[in-house]
């Protein structure tokens, strides 16, 4: 292996330690597509596996978006067989017409496999370039700081609660440790620990391409990535090249740095908001209350975060900017005699 590839592996290993992404002796599920980035990720993790003593497995999610997807899955099966790594293949049975529906379906596949096969970590091959493209995608769509931080190093995957398979006699792994909720619905402890990890966020797509070329890795490019009807692909092949040529050739590096800064700052404000929530909110029988006097003296940025956090955690309701502002104005205009919301 040449010097460039060794140096790249060292950088990734340093990021694993720096951001506390992966630990030794973990069972890791690697989500791959067969393209350059995911195959490089698979190769690097298989090299580091010797030192970190991981148990690796591969998952390929077939969205049925092109006629060659079955051939792509067979190619990946052969790769996994040659490497001696277990292979999982998920195939959708319903049309997936949007990126959001595809992501929800993928996460449901991750959920089932993680539950049955006892995985706590799923690793994806999102690169620094993907992070920049997602930054622009969210910016064009309209978002706040949390959206602009783009792809993050690690993310807890949230799932819908599943039915009680033991009571319904449906087929499932009944040996999984479970928790019983008040309404008779069963949820599984493994799900709460499931994390999505992105160890390549400091590596550009160009660097991954060079590694791939040096190692002569077996690729099967995903044809969906070239479909310009998909917004992300237009950003990749049209918007980014235009911005680099006419505005700043180092734009990718600059936007990646901004995303990393926003990630760190958002993490700080999230932790601060949680600590404040413990001070100004409390629960009574069948109710959750918020101290208005303490809320009103908070800075504007924290007021918005507290409202968002309060409704998400107590009522499982996702608020947009307009909702948050309406609630905030309502609270601020309440009489000073009102102590709680």
From Swiss-Prot:
Protein name, per record: tRNA(Ile)-lysidine synthase, chloroplastic
Gene Ontology BP terms: tRNA modification
Keyword Chloroplast: yes
Family the UniProt entry places it in: Belongs to the tRNA(Ile)-lysidine synthase family.
Disulfide bond sites: none
HAMAP family: tRNA_Ile_lys_synt
Compartment(s): Plastid, Chloroplast
